[in-house]
Amino acid sequence: MEMIIISLCLATILALLLLKQFLNRTYTAKVNLPPSPWRVPVIGNLHQLSLHPHRSLRSLSHRYGPLMLLHFGRVPVLVVSSSDVAHDLMKTHDLKVANRPQLKVVEKIFNGGREMVFSPYGEYWRQIKSVCIVNLLNKKKVQSFEKVREEEISEMMERVEKASSDSSPLNLSELLLTLTSDVTSRVSLGRKYSKEESMSDFKIQMRKITELVGGFPVGEYIPCLAWIDKLRGVDEKAEEVSKAFGDLMEKVLQEHLDATDKPTLDFVDVLLSLERHERNGVQIRRSDIKFLILDMFLAGTETTYALLEWIMTELIRHPECMKKLQDEIRAKATKLILYISEEDVEDMKYLKAVVKEVLRLHPPLPLLVPRELSEDIKLKGYDIAAGTQVIINAWAIQRDTMTWGIDAEEFRPERHLDSLVDFRGTNFEFIPFGSGRRICPGIGFAMALVEVTLANLVNRFNWRMEVQHSGDEYDLAESTGLDVCRKFPLIVFPSPA
């Protein structure tokens, strides 16, 4: 009797599997899906991702086209690798592709994703985005932080001056990370924390976050294999960084609550005042505030630092471009000027071209933050289902020879001097900050710091790397994670100009 029951169960399971396979084939025959590489049962195409997914995805796109459908486990993932497809997706279907996938690793780190970058599209996201723009990121606010930028850059320049007088090597990567974190913490948290013991660990934890979020954990896509992530320590690391940041942000909040005689209110004060009031039916909780602050801190620190690091790397690797930039800046400055102001930078066309070229070759987020379709769409004649995750490979788009010419892989700032193509979301061949509703709202905040920092570093000093390594493997080696900086610190020798 038991054997009969077991046989019936097995037969039922087999019949269901065959029925499912038949239905899948029938569905596939009725819809027009984008080109797809063959996928392995259970894992799909996850095995085709390298440590640098933007590179492996571009290689796949060369074979399967600029619009291809992958499967990470059973999750359909649309990969966009051309400006033409990106335009149709983010211009025509912007609202339908404004959502974010709900990733478990994000929920563990960011309090269920109740911050701005990873929050689902909806009223809560609209309200917190508005709060961030009005109180931190709009043009008037960014201009009001000019004195903070000047003070922190001047302090950094003193350290460079000391290294140049001693002829000692300088870890420029560490210096730039300190600069960006100090500026961001002063304008968002009210003071800087870089001199506290906990900050060294804080910087390590920041790097861990980008690696975790950009790492495509197996358990996100194949729940039955979530144990692999546990063995790799993914869950433990996520809980560790969440606690570390939560503890620091609790300290920041308590400092603000204890302060009774503050002459001006900062971003944290504004958020704390919102805790007691609803905005259009949206209630911001104490835990939300912690991770919203963290959101702003990470966005203002990591990506800006990575951009400055890549700029200095490319300029040192291309001395002819460095000289051209120095000539432009020094023509504006005199020996009596120790600080190049933001007003001075406004007229420096070659400097802006250098920044744009580095943004093109080294976008801080090579793969834009993943999106998710909220409705079925038709894209380039293909049927794309709701719930499909969307990856936009900005790195591949910005190195496309069809758009940028045969020298697309080369560092050539001159290509931007007479070009109207900009990075603010309307030119889809150049989208380092994204486009549409989900475009990064902190572009002005980042550019204000990047341009004036670069002008001062290049004006007062000449630069050379610690060792001239052969080839690009060392000079341009990339870190792993959502945002990509140098794999190795940029060790340099500055000398007075």
Curated annotation (Swiss-Prot):
Gene Ontology terms for molecular function: heme binding; iron ion binding; monooxygenase activity; oxidoreductase activity, acting on paired donors, with incorporation or reduction of molecular oxygen
Q: How does it sit in the membrane?
A: Single-pass membrane protein
Enumerate the PROSITE patterns for this protein.
CYTOCHROME_P450
* Protein's cellular compartments: Membrane
Provide the leader sequence positions: none
UniProt keyword Manganese, yes or no: no
The Enzyme Commission number assigned here is 1.14.-.-
Record GO cellular component, one term = membrane
Family the UniProt entry places it in: Belongs to the cytochrome P450 family.
What name has this protein been given in UniProt? Cytochrome P450 71A14
At the highest ranks, the source species' classification is: Eukaryota, Viridiplantae, Streptophyta, Embryophyta, Tracheophyta
